[in-house]
Amino acid sequence: MTKVSILGAGSWGTALALVLADNQYDVCIWGHREELIQQINEHHENKDYLPGVKLSENVRATTDLEAAVADVKTIIVAVPTKAIREVLAQAVSFINQKAIFVHVSKGIEPDTLLRISEMMKEEIPAELREDIVVLSGPSHAEEVGLRHPTTVTVSADSSIESAQAIQDMFMNQNFRVYTNPDMIGVEIGGALKNVIALAAGITDGLGYGDNAKAALITRGLAEIARLGTKMGGNPLTFSGLTGIGDLIVTCTSVHSRNWRAGNMLGKGFKLDEVLEEMGMVVEGVRTTKAAYQLSKKFDVKMPITEALHKVLFDGEKVETAVESLMARVKTHEMEDLVNTFENQMK
């Protein structure tokens, strides 16, 4: 069997290991916690992050990074955004041939405002990169682990052939994979939906009901599309799986860490209390800071993102943030389209 390595022993990395094992790949999961790795190998289950999901015999785990990445042509990067640079910096010294690197995280680096593929280019020497591919879409690990029907998108930095190779690698009767040439749009949609999911959780925590959440999801998508398009993404991408698809599932499901975190904020918990209680990475918090900075850099109106930024980092009450959003100056719903049309008519 062909060997594939997954860097990251969390819920998503483990779920993807199950998909690849079902497709008859020899899967090696790398993680840094000795007790977790031992548990996966002994019980064929990740009880910490994906309990109840049994892994097949062709999935093994290791803390030895060299053993994980040496002689491997496909490396899945499934660690949180903040850990990607550190893990790749360690891994590159052990990689001995060109490989396709597939990242499955969703975020933006706050300090540099780089997308994940851009971060990876800085850490992986060109002579070791066959290509960089992103896999994204509405895909809770818990449901993938149960082999429920799931559909995602892959996009490659350099060639459609790389995207198609990863499509072939993952696709089976339970896990459908599309390709999309718009890597910028795919990455931005996947990252920014976490910001809107935090806000959606807040509205639920406040008990505001379906009307408020429907409006927030819709206007949140408008913010994502505005920024993503300004950064070079294709507007159509945001109407697809990595745009509205991922946004819906993350804003409405109890499986969503970002929704759960927002829900606690809406119920009055402080951010520090929320993060401690969650015990898992909540990407939307860091991404909110990055998205706010990007909105200023590209001069894009993102009122929901700005309001959430005030709640998370300036201590504003969630009720005050909602009041500010509702009191904004009246405007046309399709403001961007109207402005574009008017400019074309001049």
Swiss-Prot record:
One of its GO terms (molecular function) is NAD binding. Belongs to the NAD-dependent glycerol-3-phosphate dehydrogenase family. Catalyzes the reduction of the glycolytic intermediate dihydroxyacetone phosphate (DHAP) to sn-glycerol 3-phosphate (G3P), the key precursor for phospholipid synthesis. Its EC number is 1.1.1.94. Keywords: Cytoplasm, Lipid biosynthesis, Lipid metabolism, NAD, NADP, Nucleotide-binding, Oxidoreductase, Phospholipid biosynthesis, Phospholipid metabolism. The active site is at 193 (proton acceptor). NADPH binds at residues 11-12, 32-33, 106, 141, 257, 281, 283. Its main location: cytoplasm. It is found in: Cytoplasm. It catalyses: sn-glycerol 3-phosphate + NAD(+) = dihydroxyacetone phosphate + NADH + H(+); sn-glycerol 3-phosphate + NADP(+) = dihydroxyacetone phosphate + NADPH + H(+). The keyword rRNA-binding does not apply. The keyword NAD applies. Pathway: Membrane lipid metabolism; glycerophospholipid metabolism. This is Glycerol-3-phosphate dehydrogenase [NAD(P)+]. GO terms for biological process: carbohydrate metabolic process; glycerol-3-phosphate biosynthetic process; glycerol-3-phosphate catabolic process; glycerophospholipid metabolic process; phospholipid biosynthetic process. One of its GO terms (cellular component) is cytosol. It comes from the Bacteria. Sn-glycerol 3-phosphate binds at residues 106, 137, 139, 193, 246, 256-258.
